């Protein structure tokens, strides 16, 4: 009997302890403050990264792109969205280094740039990592960039599957060329574009001679000497406009009379060979009705078509970030989702901005300009 009493007392004591513990837990639940949602950090200091060649041989591209990106921030950012600029020098290695910095900054919700297709290929693996970072180029045209392998990539200019046939058709039907001399600059941008133009020309019965030169080369005299007397057009799908200018000058020195047709990379004040042509991925916005106030607001001189598309790219990023913040979900994933749903009416490039499922711009086209004295451009196609 005594042992049973002890056991009974122990059980009663244990039950009492358990009851007290449950009561304490219940009180703690009542007294503890309610859990709060994770703070919307991205909207505290929302930032757009900028990547472009601010220095180096292609600095004209980066400076104009940066100027228009800054203009978009001033005009549309509402004083809250910042721009963090990084110089790539049109170099894939430098693009990777600066891209790593942007990806590591939690405040960066989107990137505008890089400028070159080879740079896009360099940063794509970085921006695809955890905390995937959406990015929008204002000038990279390599067709394969939007084949689905880079789902967080967008561009506001048409790709080279449009540029190649547009260029070849003009060379064949308008310039009436029977023989074309093509020189690529050995980059991820130039080679595929040269291939596309070459294929289209050959399909139209045009004789094509193909050559290649490294982008770092600046003396083309030996290459120019290979241009035969029967060549009507020299096609240069290059990114460094100053190199195109040197090439054209050396053609004149050697008495070569073929017409130069340059790709969008030669659409710059650095290339001004009279009588030449450049193919551009954007119109001259000065010729679009309703843009006068916008151009006055920019307040700087611009000589190429590289700047305005970067304004549009930044405009799209700003709109996506604002919508993500309004939804209380300022994450990179939400910004990417908003970019996919982009609809911007009456942009400065003309028309509306929408993206395809793979990030290409809908309905864009290439334009052809003829260069007059001093490089003055006239729209011809």
Where do the model's predicted regions map?
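Extracytosolic ligand-binding ectodomains
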Residues: 2-15, 21-381
């Amino acid at each position: 009997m005594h042992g049973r009493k002890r056991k009974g007392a122990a059980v009663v004591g244990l039950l009492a302890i358990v009851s007290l513990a449950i009561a304490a837990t219940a009180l703690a639940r009542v007294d503890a403050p309610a859990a709060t949602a994770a703070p919307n950090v991205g909207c505290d200091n929302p930032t757009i990264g900028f990547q472009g060649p601010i220095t180096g041989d292609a600095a004209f591209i980066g400076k104009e792109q940066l100027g228009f990106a800054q203009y978009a921030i001033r005009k549309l950012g509402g004083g809250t969205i910042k721009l963090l600029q990084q110089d790539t020098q049109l170099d894939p290695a430098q693009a990777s280094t600066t891209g790593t910095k942007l990806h590591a900054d939690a405040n960066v919700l989107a990137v505008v740039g890089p400028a070159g297709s080879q740079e896009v290929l360099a940063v794509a693996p970085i921006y695809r990592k955890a905390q995937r970072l959406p990015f929008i180029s204002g000038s990279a045209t390599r067709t394969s960039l939007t084949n689905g392998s880079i789902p967080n990539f967008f561009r506001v200019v048409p790709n080279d599957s449009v540029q190649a046939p547009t260029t070849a058709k003009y060379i064949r039907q308008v310039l009436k060329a029977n023989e074309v001399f093509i020189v690529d600059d050995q980059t991820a941008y130039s080679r595929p574009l040269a291939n596309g133009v070459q294929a289209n020309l050959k399909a139209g019965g045009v004789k094509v001679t193909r050559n290649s030169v490294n982008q770092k080369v600046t003396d083309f005299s030996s290459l120019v000497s290979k241009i035969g007397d029967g060549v009507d057009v020299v096609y240069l799908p290059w990114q460094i406009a100053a190199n195109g200018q040197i090439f054209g000058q050396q053609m004149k020195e050697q008495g070569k009379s073929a017409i130069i047709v340059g790709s969008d990379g030669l659409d710059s004040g650095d290339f001004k060979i009279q009588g030449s042509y450049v193919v551009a991925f954007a119109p001259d916005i000065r010729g679009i009705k309703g843009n006068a106030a916008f151009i006055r607001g920019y307040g700087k001189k611009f000589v190429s078509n590289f700047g305005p598309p970067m304004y549009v790219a930044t405009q799209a990023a700003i709109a996506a970030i604002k919508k993500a913040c309004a939804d209380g979900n300022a994450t990179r994933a939400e910004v990417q989702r908003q970019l996919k749903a982009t609809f911007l009416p009456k942009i400065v490039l003309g028309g509306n901005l929408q993206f395809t499922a793979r990030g290409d711009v809908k309905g864009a086209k290439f334009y052809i300009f003829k260069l007059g004295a001093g490089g003055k451009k006239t729209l011809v196609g």
